[in-house]
Amino acid sequence: MHILVVNDDGPPNERVSPYVRPLVDELQSAGHLISVAIPAASRSWIGKAHLIEAELTAHLVHPDSFRPDGSWDSTYKPDPTTEDGAAGPQSDWVVIQNGTPASCTQLGLHNLFTDLPPIDLVISGPNHGRNASTIYNLSSGTVGGALEAVFCGKRGIAISFGSKDPQTDSVIAAAARLAVKLVGHLWRNWDERVELYNINIPMREDVEGQPVLYTRTLPYYWSRGCLYAETDRRKEEARRVLNGATNGVNGVHKETNGVNGVNGVNGVNGVNGVNGAHHGEPEAEAEAGTVSKQRHFKWSADLSDMKKRLQESEEGTDAHTVLNGSTSVTALRANFWHVPGLEGPIDLEL
């Protein structure tokens, strides 16, 4: 089977993307033809988004050239006397600058591997942590990559390894073996009502001996406050003014933001790394001491209530299953379906 692997955690990285290489290796060991297209930077919580104003750049990267921090050695050359080295470019992964999980799926299906047999299945993941409950599933870039596959006429499977804590190699290997076995089972026994599966695998040494259960998605809504916290940038802005406001030339603020110039967009900071130059902010161009007309916020989600709700979740849900040591498989369809019965004319006078 030809499988496209995408993810939302980016290149192999000991801290934020430790699971993708072990899964790819295990899939290849099972005899599958594997093509890999992944974003150049973490794109968690991005759902099925595309950065439509960004130009995407595909970098061919040999998997053995990745460093522990997710960067890679662009001068790396595999040993041609080995089986992997002799495979040439076919063994390369594709790392996509400005990529998202959904755009990696698009390019992987339609542009990057046209010299290979048609892709049968898209696997998105493994995510670094659980994707259980409606909030996680609708926000997840991992699930988003599998959703995009469905809209391209392919089957999709989202896989999440259920812990962000450091894991031993043996625990990761066990999760990867189970994932590959489960993928094979689902492929052979695919229910035609299903468009994608969402899998959550707990990280434990004996995971292969634990139950694997079909589950339903836990409904959940934010129970408190905003996901962002306001920051006080006044001192920082005053300091920037005194130091000449911007780091670039003529008010252009350049920011490579990563290794090999691939984490930002074209190495120049536009809107959160999307194309173009980031000109000096009005605040920075004003004189120190003026009243700011800007407010600044950073991601600061309080997940304590959510974690408590997940711990108390009902038996049979994805969250309850994975938190109690079993593997969760949730069968999904790729839609926001309408509420039945609300049809026909609307009387605005009521």
Model-derived features: where do they sit?
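Glycine/threonine-rich flexible loop motifs
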Residues: 131-140
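Glycine-rich phosphate/pyrophosphate-binding loops
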Residues: 135, 146, 150-174
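Active-site metal-binding loops of divalent metal-dependent hydrolases
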Residues: 8-9
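A cross-family phosphate/adenosyl-ligand binding-site feature
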Residues: 2-3, 12-13, 17-118
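Hydrophobic/aromatic beta-strand patches that form the interior of the parallel beta-sheet core
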Residues: 35-37, 95, 123, 155-159, ...
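C-terminal accessory domains and tails appended to enzymatic cores
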Residues: 186-350
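Glycine- and Gly-Pro-enriched alpha-helical subdomains that act as flexible
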Residues: 178-182
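Short acidic, glycine-rich surface-loop motifs adjacent to enzyme active sites
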Residues: 124-130
